[in-house]
């Protein structure tokens, strides 16, 4: 009985953790393209001004010519 209860508890915790991680990822938001000379520092500063925890230049879609400045909230 104790082993079954332990497995059920682990399963429930895993499901809840996965659902929380999915919701956290929804907070990422791209606010515009990064120019070649733009760099992560400027993107980070713009995201901080927009009340996010930070940001970085990243290619969101395959084949894009310029990366996007994507802001995020810390996952902690």
Curated annotation (Swiss-Prot):
It comes from the Eukaryota. It is found in: Secreted. Disulfide bonds join 30-71, 34-57, 43-69, 47-70. One of its GO terms (biological process) is killing of cells of another organism. This is Putative defensin-like protein 62. Residues 1-26 form the signal peptide. InterPro entries: Defensin-like_dom (IPR056373). Pfam families: Defensin. Belongs to the DEFL family. Keywords: Antimicrobial, Disulfide bond, Fungicide, Plant defense, Secreted, Signal. The keyword Disulfide bond applies. GO terms for cellular component: extracellular region. It comes from Arabidopsis thaliana (Mouse-ear cress).
């Amino acid at each position: 009985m104790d082993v079954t209860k332990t497995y059920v508890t682990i399963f429930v915790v895993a499901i809840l953790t996965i659902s929380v991680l999915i919701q956290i990822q929804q907070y990422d938001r791209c606010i515009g393209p990064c120019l070649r000379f733009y760099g992560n520092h400027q993107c980070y500063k713009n995201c901080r001004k927009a009340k996010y925890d930070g940001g970085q230049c990243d290619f969101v879609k395959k084949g894009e010519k310029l990366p996007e400045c994507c802001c995020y909230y810390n996952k902690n």
